[in-house]
Each structure stands twice: as C-alpha cells, then as structure tokens.
Amino acid sequence: MEDFVRQCFNPMIVELAEKAMKEYGEDPKIETNKFAAICTHLEVCFMYSDFHFIDERGESIIVESGDPNALLKHRFEIIEGRDRTMAWTVVNSICNTTGVEKPKFLPDLYDYKENRFIEIGVTRREVHIYYLEKANKIKSEKTHIHIFSFTGEEMATKSDYTLDEESRARIKTRLFTIRQEMASRGLWDSFVSPKEAKRQLKKDLKLQEPCAGLPTKVSHRTSPALKTLEPMWMDSNRTAALRASFLKCQKR
C-alpha cells in the first residue's frame, strides 16, 4: 500500500500526509491504510478548491490552468493539510475578518462566496451513515458538510453541493479510479475492512522477517497503469503557491 500511495499521489500531498501523521505520532510505513486515506482526503480538498475563483464582482468563476489573472481571488481557503497551530490561526483570521462563527473543530475549507466553513468527507461506507457521523460530531449548522464515496455517491447539507456538476464529476472519477487501481493490486479489501487490514499487516510483518538484509529503497518510477492516476489538475504555479503556503511555517 505504501508503494501505491507514493506512486499514485502528488509528492506534495504525500509530504503533507506524512507530516500530519507524524504530528499525531503515527507512522505512515505501519499505518499504510490511514496514510492512503489521508492522501485521498487531501487530494479531494485540493480538487474541490482548484480552478475556482471569485471575480471583481464577487461572482464565482472557473478558470482552467493556463489562464492566469492576478485580479482573481481563490474562492476557497484550504485549511486541511496545515499543522494545527497554523490551521487555527487561519480559521481565527477568517472569523475575525468575516464575522462568521468560529467552529469547534478544524474544518477543511472556507468558501468565500457562501461565507461558510466546509467539512469534506471521503468514505468507504454508505454516504448517509458517514454524513450523520460527521453531523453528530460537528453539531453546528454553520459548517457545511459534503461527503463523497468511492462508488460515485455524494451527500451534502441541504442537498447544496456547492460546486458545479463537472467539478464534482472530476472528484468522483478520481476516487473511482483509485478504487479500481487498489482492487487490481489486491489492496481494496484491506483498505475497506479494518480486520482485513490487521490480518494483512501481520502477514506483511512475517514476510519481512527473513528479508531483513534485502535493500529497502523504493523505486519512484511510475508504471504505465499508474500514469493515469497522476493528479494533473494542479498547475505548476498553483502547486508552488500551495507548497509555499503550507510549508513556510515549518521553516520558522
């Protein structure tokens, strides 16, 4: 699973997921299913926000890569992926600027057009079950909830899906492709079932014992099958800007 994650996702997303896990004392090499889940969630958050801007009239518009316009403002503020201190700093700044109610839990995004925080969910189960779990945890009508599944289903607060159909279709297609690639490698069942994941982990540990002397360096070459998984939705300027924004706090 770890090899799959490193080949499947943008290196920046992998790096952010590793830092998020280490912040909570978790090891991506051991908890590989969680590693995959965090990377998937991060990518959905980025895809949710990418290409969406607000023009000078306050209208939401979509600008594809290659159509730069310095006057446009990103519609969504990405909160997910930052360390907790920086994330809460961003949330507090948004609340002070806009006057919106401060959430009890860190949300994933802020929508400047609708003036609301958004909680993104990606589930391997039924969307309505996961939605209810999220709603019960957040207990606030101020935070908008949007759940996606690997089967193409989605559910959102008051059936308000925020994004246009094409943008949501990109996310659903990506999730479905990830599921297919996991299944083709025999990884999907353990990703869905915690019990199966524990069984697979024990099996992997046993297999590693007699091979302790073998080289452990992982190849970073991408197979032809995985080239279709490479997230090309992030243009280079956007990637660089996001990377600088997320990682600058680590250098202080």
Curated annotation (Swiss-Prot):
The record marks 202-203, 206 as: Important for efficient shutoff activity. The active site is at residues 80, 108. It is found in: Host cytoplasm; Host nucleus. The record marks 195, 198-199 as: Important for efficient shutoff activity and nuclear localization. Pfam families: Flu_PA. GO terms for biological process: viral RNA genome replication; viral translational frameshifting. Keywords: Decay of host mRNAs by virus, Eukaryotic host gene expression shutoff by virus, Host cytoplasm, Host gene expression shutoff by virus, Host mRNA suppression by virus, Host nucleus, Host-virus interaction. It comes from the Viruses. One of its GO terms (molecular function) is RNA binding. Plays a major role in the shutoff of the host protein expression by cleaving mRNAs probably via an endonuclease activity. This host shutoff allows the virus to escape from the host antiviral response. Hijacks host RNA splicing machinery to selectively target host RNAs containing introns for destruction. This may explain the preferential degradation of RNAs that have undergone co- or post-transcriptional processing. The probable endonuclease active site in the N-terminus and the basic amino acid cluster in the C-terminus are important for the shutoff activity. The C-terminus acts as a nuclear localization signal. The C-terminus is recruited to host protein complexes involved in nuclear Pol II RNA processing. Belongs to the influenza viruses PA-X family. This is Protein PA-X.
